Amino acid sequence: SWTSSNNPVNLWTDGFAAIQNVNLFLEKVDEVHWTDDEESRKLFACRLKGEAYGLRALHTYFLLRNHAGFSNDGELLGIPLYDSYLGSDANFNQPRASFYDCVKHIYDDLDKAEQMLPMEYNDISNESEIPERFQPYTSRKETYNRVMGHYGRQLFNALIAKGLRAR
């Protein structure tokens, strides 16, 4: 409902703007020189992509929750889905995807986020504690702690992705 603190039109505009920003980030993330250390650079890119997929899922969820509805023929519709950045010359006049396709899109993004993020951002005390999915990126605890350790607390993590999936 409309209130002084809740404007559904702003949510539509702001939500799609956020998704556009995430899509642009995902296209550019591998080009960014995050650090001179190659292992850290790759692990940062992995983490930041995971956070981006999680944020895209979150914004898609909020848009779907607030703007899904039934068509004239009774089909439950979601929102238009964009998984790549659209330039100013793109056709933004896209039909709404089905509600099912929107939920699947959210789950797919959450799957990617969970694969790229730690359950929680905590330091480890030795190399044997590096989660298996991050071992291709680094074998050093210092690198893992720098990127996935306690400095990352309060960021989107796999636990948040699981919580969003449960909603």
Region spans (language model):
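Well-ordered alpha-helical segments within folded domains of soluble proteins
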Residues: 18-26, 81-84, 159-164
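Conserved, well-structured interaction surfaces
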Residues: 1-69, 92-101, 110-120
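Short, flexible, mixed-charge acidic loops at enzyme active sites
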Residues: 70-85
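Acidic, Ser/Thr- and Gly/Pro-rich intrinsically disordered linkers and low-complexity segments
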Residues: 127-149
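Aromatic-residue-lined binding/catalytic grooves and analogous aromatic/hydrophobic interfacial grooves
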Residues: 110-125, 131-134, 154, 158-167
